[in-house]
């Protein structure tokens, strides 16, 4: 957790430093004057945030075989971080198309709260426990004109396909375990929307962005006594990222 906090602080410090650098010359000559006329831009992205599930449970848990001890099932948000390569195509004065293949490492838990005579249960998914995503987002970016010469505001929207690179290993662990193991789908499709700022520095452009993602697919894959208490499982996440282009 300390490493995660350190990463968040580092990203914030980098964005503040870049913003200060861009605004230092904000009322003077603009930086990177020929940048916006280029058709293609490339760079890299670093991000951190939270990952969680939206759970739809059985309306009456007591009606399920073997589940009469359950009281409630709750998701518990976990941290997430990732990195990727930025590919940007200029579509017009105010629009860009962005493709940012990335690796992400989300972590989260699903907690089962039982009656007092039955111990509570937690299923963990993430990192070595079962999720390392290859993310393939395709986003449309709408940007404003330059403000103070070296700053732009923008919004992005689009969709992302994600594939769990360690799904086979997680499935083997689930099949060999003597206990129930929560196994989520290897594939996910997420709708995404975000807002951010572009800062034109002396030698590069830095962008800061907040983005929300919502899964469109049911991630629950197998059945079981306690897993059967869940009707559907969809992912959601918030991410703060910085990109260098």
Where do the language-model regions lie?
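Cleavable N-terminal export/targeting peptides
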Residues: 1-36
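Interfacial helix-start motif at the membrane-water boundary
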Residues: 79-84
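Predominantly the C-terminal beta-signal and adjacent terminal strand-loop region
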Residues: 186-191, 196-245
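Gram-negative (and chloroplast) outer-membrane scaffold detector with strong preference
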Residues: 25-40, 48-54, 86-168, 241-245
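Extracellular/periplasm-exposed beta-strand and loop segments of Gram-negative cell-envelope proteins
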Residues: 52-78, 106-134, 162-188, 218-237
């Amino acid at each position: 957790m300390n490493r995660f906090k350190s990463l968040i602080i580092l990203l914030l410090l980098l964005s503040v430093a870049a913003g200060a650098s861009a605004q230092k010359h904000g009322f003077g000559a603009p930086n990177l004057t020929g940048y916006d006329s280029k058709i293609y831009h490339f760079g890299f992205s670093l991000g951190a945030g939270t990952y969680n599930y939206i759970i739809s449970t059985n309306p009456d848990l007591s009606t399920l075989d073997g589940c009469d001890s359950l009281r409630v099932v709750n998701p518990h948000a976990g941290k997430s971080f990732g990195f990727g390569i930025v590919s940007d195509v200029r579509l017009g004065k105010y629009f860009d198309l962005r493709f940012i293949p990335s690796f992400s490492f989300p972590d989260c838990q699903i907690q089962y709260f039982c009656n007092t005579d039955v111990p509570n249960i937690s299923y963990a998914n993430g990192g070595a426990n079962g999720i390392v995503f290859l993310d393939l987002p395709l986003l449309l970016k709408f940007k404003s004109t330059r403000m103070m010469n070296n700053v732009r505001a923008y919004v992005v929207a689009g969709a992302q396909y994600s594939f769990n690179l360690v799904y086979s290993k997680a499935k083997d662990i689930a099949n060999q375990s003597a206990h129930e193991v929560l196994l989520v789908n290897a594939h996910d499709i997420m709708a995404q929307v975000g807002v951010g700022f572009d800062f034109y520095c002396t030698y590069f452009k830095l962008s800061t962005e907040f983005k929300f993602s919502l899964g469109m697919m049911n991630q629950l894959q197998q059945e079981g006594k306690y897993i059967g208490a869940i009707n559907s499982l969809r992912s959601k996440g918030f991410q703060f990222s910085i990109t260098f282009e």
